[in-house]
Regions:
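Helix-rich alpha-solenoid scaffolding regions
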Residues: 131, 137, 148-151
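A short acidic, amphipathic alpha-helical/loop segment
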Residues: 115-119, 131-135
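Residue-level signature of the C-terminal ends
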Residues: 122-123, 151, 155-158
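Short coil turns that connect the paired helices of HEAT/ARM alpha-solenoid repeats
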Residues: 105-108, 137-143
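Helix-boundary capping/turn motifs
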Residues: 108, 121-126
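Extended repeat-based scaffolds of very large eukaryotic assembly and lipid-transport proteins
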Residues: 2-115, 155-210
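Conserved hydrophobic register position within alpha-solenoid helical repeats
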Residues: 116-119, 144-149
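Buried hydrophobic core positions in alpha-solenoid tandem helical repeats
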Residues: 99-102, 130-134
């Protein structure tokens, strides 16, 4: 039934002049989620047309970010997504919508990343979505860091800390990357890295200690 529906949707998109994501791209994106969500990821990918920024010929970067989940499953998602955002939210189930937000939190467009991270943090995201939030915390768009800190500062962040405890290298490399962006872009605004929102995020919300 899933394959029949996927095939019908793909044909409709082709008739409308929009090519769906390839099977290879869909499989690559599915690797970023637990196996039990594979069917839901496929449904999401079936609804995403292959339209990219500047018409580049690939959906995502080759660089993959690997995370270990507490249940022992390993996931890997692309560093950057080059697909245009534009699928109406109403076509997805709640789980599919969360998957969509996760995917586009990796967009090459910072405004798109911010919008979808904000959507993920409107409530309590599922555990499998948290690696996508954690990854954005080591990046250079300070407005996104301020958004995340504003949402997490008053919450119980034990699941975020747990994910980092299972991925200590991600915690260390993410912290170092965040500090390097402060040094390169924001030192003139915050003379001490301890004043920087990224430092407060890692220390107060994720339990990082020097």
């Amino acid at each position: 039934m899933l394959n029949q529906r996927s095939g019908a949707l793909g044909s409709a998109m082709q008739q409308a002049g929009r090519q769906p994501l390839s099977r290879a791209d869909a499989a690559m994106l599915a690797d970023g989620f637990p196996k039990q969500l594979r069917a839901s990821v496929c449904c999401v990918c079936d609804r995403i047309p292959m339209r990219t920024y500047s018409n580049v010929g690939w959906a995502a970067s080759e660089d993959q970010l690997s995370w270990l989940l507490p249940d022992g499953q390993a996931i890997a998602f692309p560093f950057r997504l080059y697909i245009l955002d534009g699928v109406p939210a109403g076509v997805f189930t709640p789980v599919q919508q969360t998957i969509y937000h996760c995917l586009f939190s990796r967009s090459c467009d910072g405004f798109v990343r911010e919008r979808h991270i904000g959507a993920l943090l409107e409530g309590e995201p599922p555990l499998w979505a948290i690696p996508y939030i954690l990854k954005v915390c080591d990046e250079y768009v300070v407005e996104i860091l301020e958004l995340i800190y504003g949402r997490l500062a008053q919450r119980d962040t034990k699941w975020y800390r747990q994910l980092f405890s299972f991925n200590p290298r991600a915690l260390l490399s993410g912290y170092n990357r965040m500090i390097s962006y402060w040094n390169a872009y924001y030192r003139h605004r915050w003379s001490s890295y301890r004043q920087y929102v990224g430092f407060r995020l890692y220390r107060e919300c994720f339990g990082y200690t020097d």
